[in-house]
Each structure stands twice: as C-alpha cells, then as structure tokens.
C-alpha cells in the first residue's frame, strides 16, 4: 500500500468481480476503506458471463478447481439462506457427461479417480452402462464416459451476477461505469487506477477480475499474464417437443468432435 490508501479497486464487474466485492464485504474489508468496482459494460451485453453456458461441474483435472467448485455448489444449494427467499439462478442439477474415445480413456479414468478422491460424485461408465442410462446416446467410438450424478449442471450466470452485485451495493460497494486505461506505479506497487473518464482512483489493492481481458489489464501494469480471449460457440437446441429422457439430459461433452 505504497499510496497510503486502503481502498480496493476491482477491475471488472461481471460475476467474478461482483462475487469478489461481495465476499470482501463479508470479510469486513469495508471497515475504513472503499471498495470500488469498475465495469465498462454494466448491461452485460458483451461480457463473457452473459455469453457463457453457465456450466457448474466438479469434473476437473486439478484438485484446486474441484475444491473451488464445491464451495460454489454449496452456495447454489443454499442460495436463499444467503440472499433471501426470492433468490433464484435457475440451477439445474442435471449433471455433466464427458465422453472419451479410446485415445482419451486413460486420462478420463485418471481424472475420475482423482475427482472421487476429493469427494466428487462422479462415476465412470462403460459403453453398455451409458446406453442404459442415456437412451438417446450413441456410443459409437466411445470407450467410456464420466457422469457427475450430483453437484453438476448449469445456472443462469447473469442472475447470479445480479445477486452478488445487489448484495455488494447494499453493503456499501461503489460501482463505476468506466474503462481502466492504466495504472500509476510506485516501485512494484500500484498506487492508483486511471480511467477513460479522466478520473484517478487511489488504491491500496487492485483486483484483476477482467475475465478473458485479464491479460490486457495486467499488461497495463507491465505484467505478462497468459490470458487472452478466444472465440467459442454455444448452440441452443429447442427440445420442448423432445421425449422426457432427452429433456433431462446432462450437459454433454464429446472432445472427439462432431
């Protein structure tokens, strides 16, 4: 805190930035300081949060990601206890199904073993088990699959962001519609955040919550962060006239391609 300021500036006001702001208030970070969130797109029209599939899973290849997901799942299951009786993010706990070809089967088996060791309710299924459980699924070219029977599914990420943002504002967090254009440094410390509007925010700490733009934000401080945006695609299929079994399908991943 070379600037002498105790204020915390969070760059990015989508789900990560809003969650960070909210939990900082729960830790008492507002005592004697300001928390300011800077977001250039408060409508969420172009942010990654609004354009994501909203997937929630524990099927990762590193323990850290699994443990972080478990914290999130506990929050989703107890959302009303924290945010009130009307809190709803459309959590559909229908699971994740990850399919593997013969080439990827060993990696999938290893991942499932590690996931289960960390408490994830994930099951490795052979092709015949997959066909019995998911009648709509063709297992041609599939060596095995891993299914998250609980604690996985999807949400509406904008609704979750709105909950965090509303709660953070209610606790005293300030939100600015602006764009970060640079930082003032004192040695290795950031002492102020510069905005496109010309404003200058003294800062004792800065949180980079810019999502896929985090690399560009870090570069403003002379830091190389290997994060960059990459275009991906989400296809939505209208299944209202589909059989019940298909409407209850998990979020399915086939890494071998289509």
PLM regions with names:
Residues 134-142, 184-191:
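A short, glycine/Asx- and small/polar-enriched loop/turn
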Residues 147-205, 213:
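Helical element adjacent to the flavin cofactor pocket in flavoenzyme catalytic cores
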Residues 53-133, 257-258:
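Dinucleotide-binding Rossmann-like beta1-alpha1 core, especially the glycine-rich loop
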Residues 22, 26, 162, 166, ...:
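Short, well-ordered alpha-helices that flank and scaffold nucleotide-derived cofactor binding pockets
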Residues 25-48:
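Glycine-rich FAD pyrophosphate-binding loop
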Residues 2-16, 36:
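Beta1/beta-strand and adjacent pyrophosphate-binding region of the FAD-binding site
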Residues 16, 43, 213:
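Conserved Rossmann-like nucleotide-cofactor binding loop
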Residues 19, 83, 183-189, 195-258:
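Flavin-dependent oxidoreductases
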């Amino acid at each position: 805190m070379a600037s002498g300021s105790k204020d915390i500036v969070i760059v990015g006001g989508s789900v990560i930035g809003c969650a960070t702001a909210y939990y900082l208030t729960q830790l008492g970070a507002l005592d004697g300081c300001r928390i300011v969130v800077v977001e250039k797109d408060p409508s969420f029209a172009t942010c990654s949060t609004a354009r994501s599939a909203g997937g929630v899973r524990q099927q990762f290849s590193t323990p850290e990601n699994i443990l972080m997901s478990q914290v999130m799942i506990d929050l989703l299951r107890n959302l009303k206890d924290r945010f009130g009786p009307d809190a709803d993010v459309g959590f559909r706990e229908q699971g994740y199904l990850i399919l593997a070809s013969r080439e990827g089967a060993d990696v999938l088996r290893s991942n499932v073993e590690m996931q289960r060791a960390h408490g994830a309710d994930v099951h490795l299924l052979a092709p015949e088990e997959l066909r019995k459980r998911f009648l709509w699924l063709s297992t041609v070219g599939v060596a095995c699959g891993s299914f998250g029977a609980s604690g996985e599914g999807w949400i509406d990420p904008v609704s979750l962001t709105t909950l965090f943002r509303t709660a953070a504002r209610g606790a005293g967090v300030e939100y600015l519609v602006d764009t970060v254009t640079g930082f003032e440094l004192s040695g290795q410390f950031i002492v102020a955040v510069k905005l496109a509007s010309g404003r200058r925010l003294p800062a004792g700490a800065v949180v980079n919550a810019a999502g896929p733009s985090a690399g560009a934000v870090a570069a403003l401080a002379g830091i190389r962060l290997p994060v960059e945006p990459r275009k991906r695609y989400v296809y939505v299929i209208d299944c209202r006239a589909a059989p019940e079994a298909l409407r209850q399908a998990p979020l399915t991943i086939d890494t071998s391609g289509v």
